[in-house]
Amino acid sequence: MAERYGLPADVALVAGTTDGCAAFLASGASSPGDGVTSLGTTLTLKLLSATPVFAPQFGIYSHRIGDQWLAGGASNTGGAAIAKYFSRDEIARLTPLLDPDHPTGLDYYPLASPGERFPVNDPAFAPRLSPRPADDRVFFQAILEGIAAIEAKAYGRLAELGASRLASIRTAGGGAANAAWAKMRLKALGVPARDSLSEHAAVGTARLAWRGIGHAN
């Protein structure tokens, strides 16, 4: 390969990866059971596992990373479901009023439109967002609680399918900065939070190259 592209013979050539896998590596997650959730328009999960998981009916696939496997899945819940009911200004106003120590008990399944892929695979799956309380703060909190419950169910589903059980969580995406929501999520997940080393995929690519030339981490 070096000869083909006119590179010096002593140049190390290492394999690359996808941007999603690189972002996971950038987080610092390195042990089976380490999970990274991206709270964006949708809810995306990646979990480092000692064994691979392939479940096409849920859109679950696994990438090999060294002697471990990175299993991933995505739910249609997430920021799009929140944005359907609240503007950015309303979210900013309501967030300080959240009370994660007192759950609403409304058991929502927030979706912007019918259809779910993971942890439930049903293209006709209906959102569950009623009854709607008169207080917007309670409604907003119930939506966040619902997304947290879906996240916990999704990691549980990965374990049911053979992946390592979730042991710690790191978070990326716009929702990561919401401290009250983080508290709801940690309560639902039952695992400790870890700070990410970086959210930049380029850092993960550099770490992969570093390991590729013989370094442990």
Q: What label would you give each PLM region?
A:
Residues A2-I169, A177-N217:
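Active-site core segments that coordinate phosphate-bearing ligands/cofactors
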